[in-house]
């Protein structure tokens, strides 16, 4: 509802051509399913591989991409749904490196519960590798109006008065500035 998936989609449109991306939106999956999903995103068919083969293939792929001058990015949306075992696999992947640098960048996007999971003592090693945490907040009253006006413009309705002046504060009041709720309310209006 806060716009994190939309933000990821916008980010992916702007990404440089030398970046190889795997985007995962897992339901609750096992560690091996998660690793297989990553390899599938990179063009492999890992379904008959054992876990050791999957990890070796993934590590080799990461090193090959680095040697070819490409960066590798793993984006995991709805990461709050990941089990502790999967988060531990992510920690292990984040440690793959050459003598110069780490070869995998990882973005974990999720609901606020993700922060609670990452703060668990069992995941201290993963948390120590987190370079940045960012929290999307709800829109302000002015941002909500700007957001609605922008969406109307994109929809081709910029010249039409869809909402009266006194409607914008009401939309903000009933939605709290949460983009998904703003969209839902405006779509049903």
Segments predicted by a language model, with ranges:
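P-loop NTPase Walker A phosphate-binding motif
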Residues: 1-19, 28
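Switch/connector loops and helix/strand junctions flanking conserved nucleotide-binding motifs
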Residues: 5, 31-33, 84, 114-118, ...
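Conserved NTP-binding/hydrolysis module of P-loop NTPases
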Residues: 18-20, 29-48
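Central P-loop NTPase core of STAND/AAA+ ATPases
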Residues: 43-66
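Conserved Walker B catalytic segment
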Residues: 59-63, 67-108, 120-121
